[in-house]
Amino acid sequence: DTLNPFAVGRFGTGRVDAYAAVASSMTTWASVLSASFKDESDDGLFTPGERARISLTVRNDLAPLTNATVRVRNVPAPFAAIIEQQGGTIGAMGQGETREARDVIVVSLPDEVPFNASLDLLVEIIDNGRIVGRELISTNVNTTYRTLDRNDLAMTANSSGNLGFNDYPDNAQGDGVTYRGSRNLLFEGALMIGTAPGKLVNVARGADTDQKDTAFSTTGVIALRTDSVPSGIRAVTSYSDALDPYRVGVDVRQHLYQTADDSLRNVVLSCYDVRNTSDTTLSNVHVALFFDWDIGPNGQQNVVSWDAQHGIGRVRNVARPEFPVVGAAMISPVVTHFFAVDNDGFTTLNPGIYDNFLRGEKWLMMSSGIARTQSAATDASMVIGGGPFALAPGETRQVCFALGAGDTDSLVSKGIAAARNRARTLGLNTQTFEPAPRTSRIVHIEGGPTLTPGSTTITFSIHFITGVIIDVVDLFGRTVSELYTARDDAPGLHVATVNIPTVSGGNYFIRLRTATTTDVAPIAIVR
């Protein structure tokens, strides 16, 4: 029983009298079809020290029972419930009869219970002194996740930066994201914060895609509150990267807002107050959300796209238009970044996430501007965020996102526009969206800004077919070395392998020139 608590009461001993089992016309067996737990605070959260009443639905499967009763006991586990009322009488039951046994069991939790623990209890059905049925019933207790369900867009959030579910990839803890009672729309939602590929903390899947990165440690368990949100609720939680080996040096206080007002019934706001806990200024800070959407029965035929007019990343099932459209927008006054992901991608600039999801890939997606604007029709994800910005020691910066769903693109756009306005009313860090022209730019210099002579890679984006020249220039704008030339590069992201010249150590610029634009990035060459 200790090694297999899920099978307590199911393993027998001794010999099986097979003939008697099939020959008897009075074989008895009953089943527990369902069990419901009602905690005394009636908030759906079974917490340490709290009492709960358990109701059972019992079915008699075989021969009639004359005076059935139920009783419960603990099974081997890290903690034991305090059983205050062990069971009660159900009575006579005919073959095939189903009966409700309300509040038949009362248990309470001890004062010390692990987070997100499973309370497992063995229910035994007894008739005339003989056990005629056994069933293990379970519920999650002392949970660190909550579901906001006051409007049409219901969403679970946890206490360490995930949206949708707490326990990727099992996804048994939480309700995901649903619209008007739909099936779940989100497989994975995760916060990512970084200043460089090697300084990136997150709770998305990682090098092993069956496990998520666990950069954030809970410092305040998520709580639901009704203050500050007219006709709605908000959730508050906090967490820190202090224990992560890739730590940036931040803690986060997250606020989620949900209201039932007509114009906001299809949206949720999620804001992140990011504070620098280190003793040095953090530069190049980026904050992003990763979403692996599953719109439809199997998550296929999803297309993620960028709506440049409204500043919204959208996803829809192109084969099943009856399913909702979902949108996400970064609504704070920092530069927006967006990347549409083919989950089965395999190229440098469309790396995919089936084989792994490395920090370098996460950084590419969260810091490359409006980079990949549409996915294929496949199992698709998106990364949307904002940056760069700097944080002095102890300084806090808020980055907010609006998530919306609807039957049409128009409903999503209207909901997110209303969310921007409500965010402003609530005093959150937001701004009105103004479509910005896309510009060609240097996205990333491998190893930069301090470089040594030799090979490195430069990632750059261009927004129309154009010739491209990348060179090294000195402080007076004089060309020191030409690194890359192309006559007709296509729009999108490009990665060029270049050789940094052997020159006197000092400060220089890498310059990108197209037919209409110029961009520069400062570097230091050391020898």
Predicted regions, residues:
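C-terminal subdomain of the subtilisin-like protease fold in secreted/lumenal serine endopeptidases
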Residues: 1-50
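Surface-exposed, proline-anchored Ser/Thr-rich loop/turn motifs
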Residues: 46-47, 431-463, 473-478, 505, ...
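Intrinsically disordered, low-complexity Pro/Gly/Ser/Thr-rich segments with frequent PxxP/GP/PP motifs
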Residues: 80-113, 385-395
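Terminal connector regions
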Residues: 102, 106-148, 405-427
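Beta-strand-rich N-terminal accessory domains
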Residues: 138-225, 261-263, 284-285, 299, ...
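Extended, loop-rich substrate-binding clefts of extracytoplasmic carbohydrate-active enzymes
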Residues: 197-270, 378-380
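Glycine-rich (often Gly-Gly/Gly-Pro-rich) flexible segments and glycine-rich loop motifs
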Residues: 281-379
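C-terminal tail/sorting-segment detector
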Residues: 482, 496-497, 501-527
